[in-house]
Amino acid sequence: MFWIKKVVSQVIMPVPFILLLLLLSLFIWRKPRLAKWAIASAFTLLLLLSSQFSVDYLVKPLETQYPINTTPIADTCVVMVLGSAHSDIEGATAVQSLSAVALARLTEGLRQLKLGQDCSLVVSGWGGELTQHPHAEVMAKAAVELGIDASRIIEFPLARDTLEEAHYFKESFGNQPVRLVTSASHMPRAMAIFSGKGLTASAAPTDFRARDDFYWRFTADNLLASQRALHEYIGRLWLWVKQE
């Protein structure tokens, strides 16, 4: 089920879907009306999703649900940074191996640690099929490189998605409150998942992608932000279907 979800979600993402429409137009070139419809749909999607319009109506509603968190953490302190991605780069440090998203999340996680006393840092993520080391391990090494004592770090190297991250947290910490760090667009779904597990999480969003810009500008950054937002809406739909 995990792999089916991954494959389906990737196919219906904007860039693969646009490419599929263009490919379809090649196969149906003997039917000019359908071919023109496929090409027009592909370019319309590309223009809309790379525009400021898409950012305003898809991305901002997700990223504005939880504000930047500067509240001190009282009592027992656990900060959990949800996983993202890294690459195996020969000779690179752990910090240099992290994706931009992972580094943004880890940096926010370290900021949140300073808001509490003797906080534990939880990092998560498996290695997938393309890397030699679990993402949690690389995140932990990066945190140490950035000055965090290794004894404060707990790894969940088997967690493949947010559902499993919440599962492993509950297994390890029970109902202990957690300061949850993830990308701003992902935060609403992450909070819904943790709440669904009966966990008390306070949101610490980072990696904000919605930026104000001119409506006539079409950028790859807008397209990436729109793709992330659509991924989240599809994820929420999947979560709703599973709960029914």
Regions found by a protein language model. Give the residues of each.
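Membrane-embedded alpha-helical segments of integral membrane proteins
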Residues: 1-28
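Hydrophobic alpha-helical segments of integral membrane proteins
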Residues: 3-8, 54, 58-62, 230-237
